[in-house]
Regions:
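A short mixed-secondary-structure module that forms the rim of ligand-binding clefts
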Residues: 129-165
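Generic beta-strand structural signal
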Residues: 116, 130-131, 213
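A short, Trp-centered hydrophobic/proline-enriched beta-strand micro-motif
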Residues: 103-118, 153-158
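Charged, gly/pro-rich active-site loop segments
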Residues: 42-43, 47-95, 168-239
Length: 239
């Protein structure tokens, strides 16, 4: 695991905390307790108190400096640093990773779906089903649709209960939610895959809405992959 050391002045420690949390796999040191031996760290970031605010310097051989103004700019800087400092380790071949993700989804049936708009967020546990390789949810509605209709952006997680680092397993997905027209053939296929006939819908107390989750990024965390020589964290981006 690549660990990044962050050395910070006391006056700008919140900036260091933001960087450390967003980048991940970081160890933070006040400047007066900075280690003398850097051999155990893959990267180093310094956060100094400048006249106009924090000065963030990232890198050892090649250095890049940021002067973030406020939390939003600090988070943006952290994202850029994370992309440079945290490339995927021991990645799986794409086809093997796709198969692993498919198997994980097939072995589960419930996800936590996060939607949001502005400062409003919602996370809902939902049963999912897969039809012709696509991921769907069926629901009677609710506040999750506030975010779906507002911007369509979703994040979803499927995971096992924690029982030790070696058996740790979870899948985080990012993408868009697409509402399926109840009069479409796609809606019919999803309903029938769920074991419901269209005529039965008329007898239900409330309408069932179908939503397709078009996933653009999968992040799989699977401790068992280490035994195959791969990193536990694998990323599959489809865009």
């Amino acid at each position: 695991m690549n660990i990044t050391a962050i050395i910070y002045d006391a006056a700008v420690r919140k900036t260091a905390y933001i960087l450390g949390t967003v980048i991940g796999n970081c160890k933070l040191f006040p400047a007066e307790r900075a280690p003398r031996d850097w051999s155990g760290y893959a990267n180093v970031i310094t956060v100094a108190a400048g006249e106009g605010g924090p000065v963030v310097t990232a890198g050892v051989q090649k250095r890049v400096t940021f002067r973030p103004k406020g939390e939003d700019e600090t988070v943006a800087a952290a994202e850029l640093i994370a992309k440079a400092f945290c490339p995927p380790e021991a990645p799986m071949p794409t086809d093997a990773l796709k198969a692993r993700i498919d198997d994980f989804l097939a072995a589960h049936n419930t996800l936590a779906l996060a939607t949001g708009c502005g400062n409003w967020v919602r996370c809902t546990p939902l049963e999912y089903l897969r039809v012709n390789g696509a991921l769907y949810i069926l629901t009677e509605g609710g506040l999750k649709f506030k975010g779906i209709w507002w911007n369509g952006a979703i994040s979803a997680a499927v995971y096992d209960s924690y029982d030790g680092i070696d058996s740790l397993a979870g899948l985080q997905m990012t993408g868009k939610a697409v509402y399926i027209d109840p009069l479409s053939d796609e809606y019919r296929s999803v309903i029938e895959a769920r074991g419901v006939q269209l005529q039965q819908l008329q007898q239900m107390p409330a309408m069932l809405h179908a939503v397709r989750l078009d996933i653009t990024r999968y992040e799989l965390l699977d401790g068992a992959l280490r035994s195959d020589g791969y990193a536990a964290r694998q990323v599959l981006s489809l865009v």
